[in-house]
């Protein structure tokens, strides 16, 4: 048999795996093979001999006193008197090891070992792929549609060598049906990795176009200042297909974060909006002062004042600004609440008209120098 260390090195190189991880799985495969061949009730151990570079597999028995009930209840123990028949020098508490050579056990044993090795190496590959893609959650990917279910509820994709899917809830539904997400087999779709699932069948990647992370990823792809870390997306909230709000921070006073994201004549923000089926994107500058943040997040409405009371923001507006503050179907006030983390309560205030006396004074001041 080829030296086990050579086999481990070969598998590690071929599968691009860490040799230490492969070694661990190979030892596990040998132990599982022993349990299949001889029974799980026995204790087995294995290690790789540094001199021969081969694996040593053995059954282990712990020496106990002749009157110890463990010897009758478990096959992992042997009485002292029986142990001395094998080795006169043993004492209670010692371990006796029986070497097992799977090669000497015939074709069935070799086939069992081969299956165990394949099973454990495939599991290792799945785990590494899972770790790799799980670390990419929130990242933008391009995926090709391979099939669509009969009711158009789920899209299926090829992503590198893995399979992905996108349920209907993860696709953008616009107020204008003509703008909503519609894909056919063969289409290339931009989305983010929302979740990575692993089971005995393999790895399945859930994609999404409705997550706020998708908007953040698109902005990073369109705006160099975000990609380079000069502008940070501090908060992001979406009502997919309708409206979104993004709060930005510039790490340098020389950078206008809103101008950087909007782009010349709106080219950058329009490109992102187009990918989001025409979703309107409000861009504001983040502030650590809650009153300022709420005021900015309520745009395009003009706010008279804001009072913060624990988790609630009391927003005072003129009646003329109420419809803008609420937004179509409540989108503006909902997004403001999502991005600021405050419950928004609107209060109308009466516009104060100048008195006749004040109006006369203002008029006189205009003509006093004539």
What spans do the regions from the language model cover?
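RNA-contacting regions in translation and RNA-metabolism proteins
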Residues: 1-370
